[in-house]
């Protein structure tokens, strides 16, 4: 693989994201790591942890080079207010969004081959006056994508979501034939192009207990899910379901599957996070670029103490590199 540039956003400056990025610099990488962040923030966290860090200037006019141990390439975005580990400040809500916007725009214009995001604090961003539902929705809107799919993955399991951050009472109405067609199409396409799976097999959850029990526990399966699955199978997609979510996550089903499509957030993700928390990666499918993320939050109570585990960030970066290779 020719060296590529990967852009990283550390996320909430008062959280563990900045120090996790500093920990990424403690090894060499086959790609150039361009960090969209405040220089003083990164140096201060490196000093707190007692870790070496040299920040190199980002030069868009120069070809990318593999990142050497102890260094990061800096694309500067200045904090509105100095950050104290563990202490949120609404003054920096706009800073977080600025880093996301610059990183996203760089992916859209071809500067970067992939984007890896650290954890943000949605509450403080909204309190700063910036409407923000999450990374997935932000990148969908900024890239003018018609629709995107949130998927979490470990080495053993991939779970995509038909709906993301919705209250339970809104989910049934949200799962329309048009939505399901689009979600399944994106999932099938990206499993082939970004994951290199020639004929992906997807297990599809029902919405209701026992996948509706033949209409006795809800009719969404009969009215919506089954007709769409039949339609997509006729186009050559390898889909099984709808299957009851309480029995789907068994080896006899998962051993032959490349991904699971859950109907809502808390239907599929508890199983994945129980199995692989700290080793899981959040991936946004359907974007015109590769985006992966850690599977944990800002952990304000750990910030600046050197106790945060960099494992999920490393996994997210390694997966992004694999996806870059698959798309070349």
Curated annotation (Swiss-Prot):
Chemical reaction(s) catalysed: 4-(phosphooxy)-L-threonine + NAD(+) = 3-amino-2-oxopropyl phosphate + CO2 + NADH
GO MF term set: 4-hydroxythreonine-4-phosphate dehydrogenase activity; cobalt ion binding; magnesium ion binding; NAD binding; zinc ion binding
Gene Ontology terms: biological process: pyridoxal phosphate biosynthetic process; pyridoxine biosynthetic process
Species this protein is from: Enterobacter sp. (strain 638)
Subcellular compartments: Cytoplasm
Sequence positions that bind a divalent metal cation: 165, 210, 265
Keyword terms, alphabetized: Cobalt, Cytoplasm, Magnesium, Metal-binding, NAD, NADP, Oxidoreductase, Pyridoxine biosynthesis, Zinc
The organism's place on the tree of life at top rank: Bacteria
Cofactor entry: Zn(2+); Mg(2+); Co(2+)
Disulphide connectivity of cysteines: none
PANTHER family: 4-HYDROXYTHREONINE-4-PHOSPHATE DEHYDROGENASE
Phylogenetic lineage: Bacteria, Pseudomonadati, Pseudomonadota, Gammaproteobacteria, Enterobacterales
InterPro entries listed in its UniProt record: PdxA, PdxA_fam
Ligand binding (substrate): 135-136, 273, 282, 291
Other facts: The active site is located at the dimer interface.
UniProt record similarity statement: Belongs to the PdxA family.
Protein name per the record: 4-hydroxythreonine-4-phosphate dehydrogenase
HAMAP family named in the record: PdxA
EC class (word): oxidoreductase
């Amino acid at each position: 693989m020719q060296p590529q540039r990967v852009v990283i956003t550390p996320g909430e400056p008062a959280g563990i994201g900045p120090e996790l990025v500093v920990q990424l610099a403690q090894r060499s990488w086959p790609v150039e790591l361009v960090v969209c962040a405040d220089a003083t923030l990164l140096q201060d966290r490196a000093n707190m942890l007692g870790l070496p860090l040299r920040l190199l200037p980002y030069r868009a006019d120069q070809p990318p080079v593999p990142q050497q141990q102890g260094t990061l390439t800096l694309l500067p975005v200045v904090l509105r207010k100095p950050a104290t580990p563990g202490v949120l400040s609404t003054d920096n809500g706009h800073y977080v969004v600025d880093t996301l916007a610059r990183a996203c725009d760089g992916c859209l214009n071809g500067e970067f081959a992939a984007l890896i995001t650290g954890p943000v604090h949605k509450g403080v961003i909204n309190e700063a006056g910036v409407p923000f539902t999450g990374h997935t929705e932000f990148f969908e809107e900024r890239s003018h994508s018609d629709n995107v799919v949130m998927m979490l993955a470990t080495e053993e399991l991939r779970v995509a979501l038909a709906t993301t951050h919705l209250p339970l009472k809104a989910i049934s109405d949200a799962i329309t034939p048009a939505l399901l067609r689009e979600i399944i199409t994106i999932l099938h396409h990206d499993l082939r192009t970004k994951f290199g799976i020639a004929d992906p097999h997807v297990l599809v959850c029902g919405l209701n207990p026992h996948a509706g029990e033949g209409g006795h526990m809800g009719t969404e399966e009969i009215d919506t899910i089954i007709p769409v699955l039949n339609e997509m199978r006729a186009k050559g997609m390898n889909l099984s379901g709808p299957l009851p979510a309480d029995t789907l996550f068994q080896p006899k089903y998962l051993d032959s599957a490349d991904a699971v499509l859950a109907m809502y957030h808390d239907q599929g993700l508890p199983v994945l996070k129980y199995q692989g928390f700290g080793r899981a990666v959040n991936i946004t499918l359907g974007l015109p670029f590769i985006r992966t993320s850690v599977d944990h939050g800002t952990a304000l109570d750990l910030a600046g103490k050197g106790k945060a585990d960099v494992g999920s960030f490393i996994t997210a970066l390694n997966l992004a590199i694999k996806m870059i290779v698959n798309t070349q």
